Amino acid sequence: MSGELTEPGRARTNAMVRALERTATGWRLTIGSAADPEYLDADAVILATPAAPAARLLKDSAGEAAARLAEIPYASMAIVTLAFRGEDLFQQQSPAQQRSGYLVPAVDGRAVKAVTFSTLKWPHLAAQAPVHVVRCSVGRSGDVAVLQRDDEDLAALAAAELAGAIGITATPVARRVTRWGGGLPQYNVGHLDRVAAIRAAVAGRPGLAVAGAAYDGVGIPACVSTAKSAAAQVLAYLARPQALRAT
């Protein structure tokens, strides 16, 4: 798939973009270190970064969009993945185990805010039975203390809360902790108006579009939708005659 996405062009990874500026013919990206910068000219640019780096890149070329992007807060979280033997996991059936997972309201005071029974949710994982995978999302906005625990302690906490919530007391046969520092955008009151203002400001910059989780949701469908919309905007712009692209 990666080959098809870049054909007939090329993809560059691990290339830090330090600045973005509008030119007479499109956009110029400053890449690399300050001591040895590289300049890349582009007809159009899609920013698919989190809000903070997008705000930094747009500060000079789209100040209103940058200001509104800077208002979007982010929270940190961790995913604790636990693997159980099937006979251990389902010794005590609960309504939650017959679904794809459950959510935990903040009022409960638990560190785990959501649980997904991945093996039940995704049919292709069922082939891995008798090992079943359970994913626990840990961390809430404004609560960073729990994420200061080391991996072993955090995994033990998730397993304990799983037992307390739905009675799974089996010992996991494997565990993994994946941390996402500042990776979860928060959609506070006024977010829809904020996003509308960002998109209106960006629309006034020919050949520029934005996409990603900062706008319409963190789920894959929402992110794909923003990507399709951004791609359509850029394609429509590039379809214009060269002489009309600056307008």
Predicted regions span which residues?
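Helix-loop-beta segment of a Rossmann-like dinucleotide-binding subdomain
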Residues: S2-E7, V138-S141
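Mid-domain catalytic core of redox enzymes
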Residues: M16-V134, G139-Q148, E152, G164-A165, ...
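Conserved flavin/dinucleotide-binding core of flavoenzymes
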Residues: K113-T247
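A conserved beta-strand/loop element that lines the FAD pocket in flavoprotein oxidoreductases
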Residues: L5-R18
